[in-house]
Amino acid sequence: KCNTATCATQRLANFLVHSNNNLGPVLSPTNVGSNTY
């Protein structure tokens, strides 16, 4: 697992995107980064 602040933020953003698709366009740049792990 990744414990860095950046990775944690990406994981949180990815969780939010899956929780509420309305946030997808807002978090899309971060979501792309989260998909790399």
UniProtKB/Swiss-Prot annotation:
It comes from the Eukaryota. SMART domains: CALCITONIN (SM00113). InterPro entries: Calcitonin-like, Calcitonin/adrenomedullin, Calcitonin_CS, Calcitonin_peptide-like, IAPP. Signal peptide: none annotated. Its main location: secreted. GO terms for biological process: amylin receptor signaling pathway. Keywords: Amidation, Amyloid, Disulfide bond, Hormone, Secreted. It is found in: Secreted. The modification Tyrosine amide is found at Y37. One of its GO terms (cellular component) is extracellular space. Transmembrane segments: none annotated. It holds the Pfam family Calc_CGRP_IAPP. One of its GO terms (molecular function) is hormone activity. Disulfide bonds join C2-C7. Belongs to the calcitonin family. Can form homodimers. Interacts with IDE and INS. Interaction with INS inhibits homodimerization and fibril formation. Amylin/IAPP is a glucoregulatory peptide hormone that plays an important role in the regulation of energy homeostasis. Selectively inhibits insulin-stimulated glucose utilization and glycogen deposition in muscle, while not affecting adipocyte glucose metabolism. IAPP function is mediated by the CALCR-RAMPs (AMYRs) receptor complexes. Amylin can also bind CALCR receptor in the absence of RAMPs, although it is more selective for AMYRs. The mature protein is largely unstructured in the absence of a cognate ligand, but contrary to the human protein, it does not easily form fibrillar aggregates. This is Islet amyloid polypeptide. It comes from Cricetulus griseus (Chinese hamster).
